[in-house]
Amino acid sequence: MGEAAYVTVSALTKYIKRKFDVDPHLENIWIKGELSNVKIHTRGHIYFTLKDENARMQSVMFARQSERLPFKPENGMKVLVRGGISVYEPSGNYQLYAKEMQPDGVGALYLAYEELKKKLAGEGLFDDRYKKQIPAFPATIGVVTSPTGAAVRDVITTLKRRYPLVKVIVLPALVQGENASRSIVTRIEEANEKEICDVLIVGRGGGSIEELWAFNEEIVARAIFASNIPIISAVGHETDFTISDFVADIRAATPTGAAEIAVPHTTDLIERTKTAEVRMTRAMQQHLGQKKERIQTLQSSYAFRFPKRLYAQKEQQFDLAYQQFQAQLTALLDRKSRQLERETYRLEALHPHEQLKQARTRYQEQTNQLRKNMNIQMKQLHSQFQTVLGKLNALSPLQVMERGYSLAYKEDKLIKSVSQIEEQDRLEIKLKDGVLTCEVLEKRGEEK
């Protein structure tokens, strides 16, 4: 028998690990199971066991993958995990190195719930600033729920017991199943369009997450947000929270709790009325007491004890005030009279008749001055004319003719020399007192 061949544990483990690593079926595989022993390391790594009824597997998801998870893994959660199978050499155990994880079944609903909750919160649908006030004394309550469930009976019973005056209108709707969300939305919109109530209670009794899912639908949440009527959400039990609870104006733990929120209790109203009556009575008594003291004070005052003296004093004050008034009135009338005279004089000066009169006066003055200036000018011109005339007369031929001389003309031309005429020419001789027509018989020139 030959010597046996031995391998070390490490070598065998490495060999087995290589077998896992090169197997294409184990490199990228989806595994369905339940989470247990979940431990989240401070660095972000997640260590957990993935199991089913018959087996379990050690698993790990490193931080670079776990930080992308949209939910927090918890024990008992059904999940689908994608990853690769390999061997962890120090322990020799095979384990799953997870790359992706998502809830399975109900877990998927939970994931969708969280995603919608985050989306609507980001849009502000949960903000308190949009919450409407519930009326203190509503006349009509609308209830959107199943007409045959226990919830509607609990709501009606509680409303009538607490506040018999209220009117209850049931708006029947499907509260689970495929068409439930659309049915709930239709009833909410109908109540708003017809304005049939002061408050709406929207809800149902408890159930599984699948049964309550209609109240986690986005269309229901947006219908509640858009409602002009205040809405109380009452879905399931106290531990159940739906998207509708966050959007509604107020959330009640149960349908019965919603009814208690919607209306006051008659007994409480009676007690509040009695308390208010006592406070009003005390306030009236205190007010009347104060007025009584005031009247007593007035009755003991000087005016009530000596009314005639008060009258005489007031009469004296009146006389003094009247005299002051008369003096002020007289002074005022004097000022107004003087002002009126000044205004009258000014207006008369501006009157057309007065202005015409003044214009005539100015015209007459200017005319007289013009005539005076013209006379002076005429006298000056006449004197100058006489002077010039005297000079002209001294030079005028007529003055020469006055001394016995005459002027000879030939054909209207003055003859200055005998050379201008011939014998037989007809001449006109102008004397001082007439004209002679003559014929030249002979011309003789002067000897030089």
UniProtKB/Swiss-Prot annotation:
One of its GO terms (cellular component) is exodeoxyribonuclease VII complex. It catalyses: Exonucleolytic cleavage in either 5'- to 3'- or 3'- to 5'-direction to yield nucleoside 5'-phosphates. Its EC number is 3.1.11.6. GO terms for molecular function: exodeoxyribonuclease VII activity; nucleic acid binding. It holds the Pfam family Exonuc_VII_L. Its main location: cytoplasm. Signal peptide: none annotated. Belongs to the XseA family. The gene is xseA. InterPro entries: Exonuc_VII_L (IPR003753), Exonuc_VII_lsu_C (IPR020579), OB-fold_nuc-bd_dom (IPR025824). It is found in: Cytoplasm; Cytoplasm, Nucleoid. One of its GO terms (biological process) is DNA catabolic process. Bidirectionally degrades single-stranded DNA into large acid-insoluble oligonucleotides, which are then degraded further into small acid-soluble oligonucleotides. Heterooligomer composed of large and small subunits. Keywords: Cytoplasm, Exonuclease, Hydrolase, Nuclease. HAMAP family: Exonuc_7_L. This is Exodeoxyribonuclease 7 large subunit. CDD domains: ExoVII_LU_OBF. PANTHER family: EXODEOXYRIBONUCLEASE 7 LARGE SUBUNIT (PTHR30008:SF0).
